[in-house]
Structures are given as C-alpha cells and as structure tokens.
C-alpha cells in the first residue's frame, strides 16, 4: 500500500492506494457517526455496502449513472435525502464511484449546512488518477461543464485498485487519458513507461501513484488555480467543447485525449498519437469543430474573450498561453485541418 499526504494550509489529508482496502475502510476513515453513502447505478453495489458495513449508522443513496446526474435538479433531490436522514454538521458523506459521484458528492458536502466532511472512494481509473483529489467539486448547467461548484477538499481518499477489475475496457482507456495528461506536462519518465509498456496490472498502482504525486504537488502549490494548477487543464479546453458537442457520445477521458492532440508540438503529437492508439483512445473522431469551439467561449477557462490554453512543446514540459478567442479558434482549425 502507498500513502500520500496532501499538505494544504487549511486542510491536509491522506490518500491511500492499494489492493483490498475497501473491506477495511473504517481503518482509514472516521465512520463512527452518521454516514451518507453516495453512489451511482453503474457502480457495483457491494462497494457501497462495504462502506456501510464498516459504519456506525449509514444509508446508501444511488443516483442514475452518467453526466446528467451532475445537475442542480439531482443535487436538490439528494440534499433532501440527506436532510431526511437527519444529518448534522458532524456527520459525513462518502462518495463511492467515478468522477460524477465525486464531483456531485463533494459539492453536496460543500453546501449542506455550509459544509460537512466528505471522503472520496474513487472506483474508476479517471477518478483515481485525477478527480478524486484537489478539492474541485461541481455540477453542470445549461450544457456547460462544471460551471457551478466550489473548492471543498475531502477529509481523506481511499483508492482500492481492485475496483478497476469490474470496469469495462473502454472506461479503463478513458481514465488512462488523465494519466497521460499528467505525464505529458510534468513527467517524461512516466510518459515513456506508458509508451513502452502500456497500462497493465503489473504497473497500474505505480502509474496511479505517480500521477497522483504530480497532481498533489501542483495543488499544494496552487490550490485555487491562480497559476500553476492551470496545467491540469491540458487537453480540457478543447476537450470540454468536444464533450459538450457530442452530448454523452464520448467519455470525458476520450474527449481529453482528442483535446490534447492539437495542443502539442508536431513531434510530440506523433508519439502521443501512437500512445493513445495503444491505450484504445480515439485519435480521429468526427465532431463539429465550430460547435465545439462555441462551447469553449463559455468555459471557465475563457475570461473576457481570452482563452488560457496549455501547450506541450516537448514531453515533460508545458507552456501557458493567453490567446484571444479568435486566435484560439484559428489555431485549432489550422491544426485539425479545417482551414
């Protein structure tokens, strides 16, 4: 087992990574209080039940699987369920699932009674390597991803790698995009490991831990995304636009993969294309580039007509460039061959 510690001025917490951790979750989390367990219909129910079995008093609430559950409507329904469970400010929410459950669960915890504790138990590769740590919580509104939210750090994170054994191959592939993202901007050796060996049962925990160490370092330096943390948006500026344009046809990680391709130097793009293909991620997918770019204008990363885009000039390094919307559109269209 690996234990990392996120060290922040106001709230530090441990991140536990290993096999078989879920069955003894009470060794890592304080569950000696009321525990509201949030999961979704795509997550094997036994994961939530393991948390319940280790809790003093718990209830499991299941939301529908998918991005549509990251909404204010679903949020209101869950808040009412928390209220009906008579939760106090001393009680805790445990999010058991992927990025949707973690994002919604964290935002619920941030807003219920002005803030309660929550623990993250990510069960997808994407959430394990990225979204489960760092404190970003949000829901979608009006077709815009993560536009309503708050920074609310978890009390702890438990990553049981055994949960990945039940994931479909496509979801594993989608999650691997976030590990590639971390490697491209910050860890040349990690990229070469994935490039040469892929992601296998033998190197899975190492890749998760190395990706988490990158994000941990970045968040500790810039918790509220005033500077350095923007590098974690690599692939997401255009990726979010593609995701909105395709309306659930593609997974988030697949859109990030497509979004990364055109933000690299040509020689990096060649190697990245090969890696994405090896991992089972799309490198050539039909989407309406104009519609995708329109969504970019409304993204959080676009402020006052300026898009802050992350580029990778060589593997393990990054550049943050401020471009006008028109400059960004022209660049993307040139690189995708649209003009």
Residue ranges and their predicted role:
Residues 65-66, 96-98, 234-235:
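Glycine-rich beta-strand-to-loop/alpha-helix junction loops that act as flexible
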Residues 100-107, 128, 240-241:
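Short glycine/serine/threonine-rich phosphate/pyrophosphate-binding segments
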Residues 1-92:
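ATP/NTP phosphate-donor binding region
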Residues 14-16, 107-199:
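A glycine/threonine-rich phosphate-anchoring loop and its flanking beta-alpha core
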Residues 177-179, 269-339:
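C-terminal charged capping/lid subdomain of soluble metabolic enzymes
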Residues 18, 37, 122, 160, ...:
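Residue-level signal for inorganic ion chemistry
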Residues 79-96, 105-120, 130:
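Non-catalytic interfacial helical region
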Residues 193-291:
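Active-site segments that bind and position negatively charged phosphate/pyrophosphate groups
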């Amino acid at each position: 087992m690996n234990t990392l510690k996120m060290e922040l001025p106001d709230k530090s917490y441990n991140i536990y990574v290993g096999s078989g951790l879920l069955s003894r979750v009470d060794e890592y989390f304080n569950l000696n209080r009321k525990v509201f367990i949030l999961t979704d219909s795509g997550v094997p129910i036994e994961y939530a039940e393991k948390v319940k079995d280790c809790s003093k008093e718990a209830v499991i609430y299941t939301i529908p699987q998918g991005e549509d559950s990251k909404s204010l409507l679903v949020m209101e329904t869950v808040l009412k369920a928390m209220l009906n469970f008579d939760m106090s400010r001393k009680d805790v929410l445990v999010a058991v699932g992927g990025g949707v459950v973690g994002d919604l669960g964290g935002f619920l915890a941030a807003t219920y009674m002005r803030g309660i504790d929550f623990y993250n138990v990510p069960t997808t590769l994407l959430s394990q390597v990225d979204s489960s740590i760092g404190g970003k919580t949000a829901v979608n509104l009006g077709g815009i991803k993560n536009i309503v939210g708050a920074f609310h750090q978890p009390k702890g994170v438990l990553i049981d790698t055994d949960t990945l054994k039940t994931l479909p191959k496509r979801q594993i592939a989608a999650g691997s995009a976030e590990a590639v993202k971390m490697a491209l901007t910050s860890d040349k050796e990690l990229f070469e490991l994935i490039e040469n060996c892929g992601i296998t049962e033998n190197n899975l925990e190492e890749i998760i831990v190395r990706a988490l160490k990158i994000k941990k370092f970045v968040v500790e330096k810039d918790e509220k995304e005033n500077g350095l943390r923007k590098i974690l948006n690599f692939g997401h500026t255009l990726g979010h636009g593609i995701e909105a344009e395709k309306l659930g046809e593609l997974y988030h990680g697949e859109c990030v993969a497509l979004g990364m391709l055109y933000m690299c130097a040509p020689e990096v793009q060649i190697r990245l294309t090969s890696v994405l293909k090896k991992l089972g991620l799309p490198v050539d997918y039909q989407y309406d580039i104009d519609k995708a770019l329109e969504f970019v204008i409304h993204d959080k990363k676009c402020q006052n007509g300026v898009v802050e885009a992350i580029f990778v000039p060589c593997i393990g390094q990054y550049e943050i460039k401020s471009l006008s919307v028109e400059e960004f559109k022209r660049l993307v269209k040139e690189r995708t061959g649209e003009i």
